[in-house]
Amino acid sequence: MKNYPKRIKNTLHSVIRDMAKHPEDFCRCPEKNFTRNRKLPFEKLLTLLVKMGGHSLRDEMLDCLAFKETPASVSALVQQRSKLLPEALEYLFQEFTNRCHSPKLYKGYRLLAVDGSDLQFTANPNDPLSYFPGVNGQKPYSFLHLNALYDLNSNLYLDAVIQRRRAANENAALISMVGRSEIHEPVIITADRGYESYNTLEHISRKGWKYLIRVRESRGITSALSLPEGDFDVPVQIFLTRKQTNAVKALMKKHPEKYRILPGHVNFEFLPEGSSEFYPLSFRVVRFQISDDSTETLITNLDKDSFPSDDLKHLYHLRWGIETSFRQLKYTIGLSLFQSKKVEYITQEIFARLTMYNFCELITSHVVIQKKCRKYVYQTNFTAAVHICRQFLRGSVAPPKVVDLIKAQVVPIRPGRSTPRRTKNIKFNGFFYRIA
């Protein structure tokens, strides 16, 4: 157990060394970049980017080198990282995760969740697709949108798509991640409202995956269906078409719950524009009560006998894990604090933070907290564990001590606690206002 953190660290360094054997695959000018001796060669640069937190670049370089040597200048770091392709850190993230990940199953299925989150960074008017000018005296700001695929049983990020906020399309990002996934086990993917497009459902089904998606009750896929009041679990089959002939309109009038005419602007890749065919879609619509005054409506292609409505309620509750992980990713790992305003550099930092999150989670999840006669069950304090794991990666903590240090930092699990979500505008912490 105490050697496990060292194994994870060695795996990360192994991936970086393998990439350093062929730096030309990950840089902008293969014939020039990383061909001369520098203070920040390819391998050292990647390691530094993963180790960094949210302080200034100067302080981060000093911390990562543990003050054992004079670091390269900030200008040198910026010049070296400009040579990297954005795909370099993405490859590191995915390869490291694949080498370390041991899938855990739920009833024979990998249980995944997809969600998106906005990431604010320094206003950059030179990037119009991410830039928002301030209105009513508000300062301008810039946003990227992170779409992430998350394993709910292993608590690891598996894939991510980064989009400029004005061009963000969560459904397109989900379809991209589903299409390129190499998962061999059966999969159940859960998602919140906004992912219930016909195109997305059919892409997931054709992949052989199962889906469980929360839908809007007032509009969307279920709005035209004849559904009962209260709780229910009903099978639904509808037919999609591009035709708008009188015969089709008559069918729509006679069976409004069965037929859908797709306008030309609606993307459904399995019915090209001008097609005269009908495309069948089948799924379950399930509604259940979650409190005295609120209900949830889900659509799924899971079998009713294997997954009754109570199981679906439990599955959807598990989806909250990705919401918690986003909070930890932003405010514990440091994804809300970037060291650049160029989208290419920020993309590097996002995948570096995702790699660090998985590194910390892999180590923390193997720490066993002994049960004692206490009022509450205790779990590891992830915030403290991240600090310990980051220092371990930087070489400031020896491997045998990592597990003991994490074991000593625990917090109680208090079931049944809930607080209304408070939304507020969070200002970006500029480069000149970082703690020393």
Placement of each model-derived feature along the sequence:
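Conserved beta-strand elements of the Class I
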Residues: R110-L112
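Extracytosolic and intramembrane catalytic regions of membrane-associated proteins
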Residues: F132
